[in-house]
Amino acid sequence: SCWIAETMDWKTLARDEYNGLKLGIIISIGYAPEKIPLKQEGIRTAIRLRTKKPAQIMTANGQPTEPEQMPEWFNRGINAVLACPTAINKLPVVFDLTDGVVSASMPNQRHLVQDYDLGISKLHFELASNLKGTWELGQPGRFIVSE
């Protein structure tokens, strides 16, 4: 998948509104052609060169922690987040595990597409951790596990 927001050339769209809702992000799914434009190649390279480590985007009870001290399902979620694209490709999200409850936030981030970045990261975490439930909107959004 590819999540496109701030790098999108909005003038190329046939329409950017639907039923009164303004389009804010585009998600493309599929395989890229063998030869891709230089701009896309640069974005792809930036994602591959991200150097964040799991400990940089995880906390336990609000304090820094290491993967070895976290449950396996949590680490699977974190690893998926580290591999996923985001709208601005900076991965500014932090996942916390406090008393068995996961929350996600983007401390000190103020950009136009931060809610998209947070949602993309939440989705990848949820899918990889294999938890069933729903995320609260906003920050910090807690994950409510389904019974």
What are these regions (language model features)?
Residues S1-E147:
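Acidic, surface-exposed loops and disordered segments
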